[in-house]
Design a protein with these regions (language model features):
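Amphipathic, membrane-active segments
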Residues: 120-178, 183, 187
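Ampiphathic alpha-helical segments that act as solvent-exposed interaction surfaces
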Residues: 53-73, 102, 120-124, 128, ...
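Membrane-active, amphipathic/fusogenic segments and juxtamembrane/transmembrane anchors
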Residues: 1-88
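C-terminal assembly and membrane-engagement modules of membrane-active proteins
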Residues: 163-221
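Alpha-helix boundary/N-cap detector
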Residues: 56, 60, 112, 116-119, ...
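Short, ordered beta-strand-loop transition motifs
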Residues: 31-35, 88-92, 169-176
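Membrane-inserting effector segments that mediate pore formation, membrane fusion
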Residues: 73-136
């Protein structure tokens, strides 16, 4: 008979240490609006032998992300935040921390504001990667970049990745980054940059582009 008991001398119910961190930061004009752009980071946290006192937790992530609220302005913006921790006692899956931050920028945000938001997030992601341990640099292939782009757009905007097609691409070898334009069957377009932070493929920016309606005037007289 197979035993399913837990062999643990200490406290049984625990969230465990964080093995993986997934962060999503988006910017939107108003609380009910679709985000104009979203940034995603997916990093592993190495070091199974790390001292429990030095273990990575959500408070560290929140402290690193806090400057994003003030990007481009002196006053902090309104935001919504969700946080999820996932842990299995049998260890078959990584203990994950999922964190989502949506910042309300206001309807009058300019191109300069958007750039300030971009810069603040890339700085925060870079700091997060320093805390978790910098990932090893590795070239990102075209196929891997397309897969990342599909998944990122699907995660950021809740679209079916199989309903998206690649309409344009640009490789930036010096930065180990790819800029890919994905289009859905419904006509929505997304510009996705894979490797937005120092060429790390797990850092992605997704920007939703305004849908352009094309009127067919042939035969209309």
């Amino acid at each position: 008979m197979t035993s399913h008991s837990v062999d643990a001398p200490g406290r049984l119910l625990t969230l465990g240490r964080v093995d993986r961190v997934r962060v999503q930061v988006g910017f939107r004009a108003g609380p009910d609006d679709r985000p104009d752009q979203q940034f995603l980071l997916d990093v592993s946290v190495p070091g199974a032998d790390r001292d429990p006192e030095d273990a990575f937790d959500e408070q560290q992530a929140l402290a690193v992300l806090e400057p994003v609220l003030r990007a481009g302005t002196g006053a902090p913006r309104h935001y919504s935040l969700h946080l999820h921790r996932w842990h299995t006692s049998w260890g078959l899956n990584p203990n994950a921390l999922d964190l989502g931050l949506l910042v309300t920028t206001g309807a009058r945000s300019s191109a300069a504001d958007a750039q300030a938001s971009h810069d603040s997030v890339t700085r925060a992601f870079r700091d997060l990667m320093r805390l978790t341990g910098p990932p090893r640099p590795a070239p990102t292939s075209r196929d891997a970049a397309i897969l990342r782009a599909r998944r990122a757009a699907a995660t950021a905007y809740r679209v079916d990745p199989d309903a998206m097609s690649l309409s344009a691409e640009e490789h930036h070898p010096a930065d180990n980054a790819w800029t890919l334009r994905m289009r859905t069957t419904a006509g929505d377009a997304y510009e996705v940059v894979v490797g937005v932070v120092d060429g790390y493929a797990g850092s992605v920016r997704v920007r939703h582009e305004e849908r352009i309606e094309v009127a067919d005037s042939i035969g209309a007289e």
